[in-house]
Structure formats: structure tokens, C-alpha cells
Amino acid sequence: VVQLYNDYKDHADFLTVYVREAHPTDEWQMKSNVKEDVCYAQPKTLEQRVAIANDFVKRFNYPIPFGIDDMSNAANDAYSAWPERLYVIDENGRIAYRGGMGPFDYKPEEVRAWLAARFGAVQHPEAKPPSANAASSKS
């Protein structure tokens, strides 16, 4: 998603909204959370939710603008966002793309296709393989 943001941030506004914790330590802890050291209890206050979001942004150097759902979970309820989901809202405020629920139906490549159709594809220069001369000069 960060690469998608970097590619299209000059054409579209991006926002990540932190909703309730997907795998909190006091509910359904995952081994991957322990491995990646992202272990949090389910926040009980907005201040706790803000602290977790700020920790995420800082630890992962996350560049996408961040919003935080309130404790009534209004954004989560309106967009069925938990545990993760992608949306494109068009310039008229209408939902132009509604992705499936993550993690299995979380498909940033579908958002990329929508953005490419709307704004044009972003080309990335491919890394060149080492030349044969460079490999033979080491022998």
C-alpha cells in the first residue's frame, strides 16, 4: 500500500483509518504479532488508540496520512473496515471501489488497477541485471 501511495499521492488523497485492534493480546493474539513485536491490548480509550496508531507510524515510518476511528467505531461500522479493507471514494464522494475484507480479500493491486485506469499507469524502471562482463571480471 505504501508503494501505491508513493505512486499516486500526486493524483489522489490517501487516508489510513485505524479501527479497533485486529489481534489484541487480550482477545485473539497471533504468533505473527509476537514475531513482529506489535502486541497491544484492545484500546479502551481514544487516548490508547491514538498511542497505538502513533507507535505504528513511528516504528514503521508509515508515510500515509492517518485517521483514528472514535471509540464508538463509527468508521468501522460505516465501512465494514475490520480487520482491514480498501476503498476508493471518488471526487463526488461516492464509493468507486470497495475491496474485500482482509487479509484474504485485501488486494491493493485492484486499487492500483482502478487508479491506473483513472490517472494512467505508473512506470517503474526495472533494475538491470549485472552484465556478463562484470561477472567475468571477478574471475
Predicted features, each with a name:
Residues 1-60:
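Structural microenvironment flanking redox-active thiols in thiol-disulfide oxidoreductases
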Residues 5-8, 18, 40, 62, ...:
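Sequence-level detector for tyrosine residue identity
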Residues 9-13, 61-65, 83-84, 91-92:
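Loop/turn elements at helix/coil->beta-strand transitions in domains of secreted/extracellular proteins
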Residues 17, 67-69:
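Conserved beta-strand termini and adjacent loop/short-helix elements that scaffold enzyme active sites
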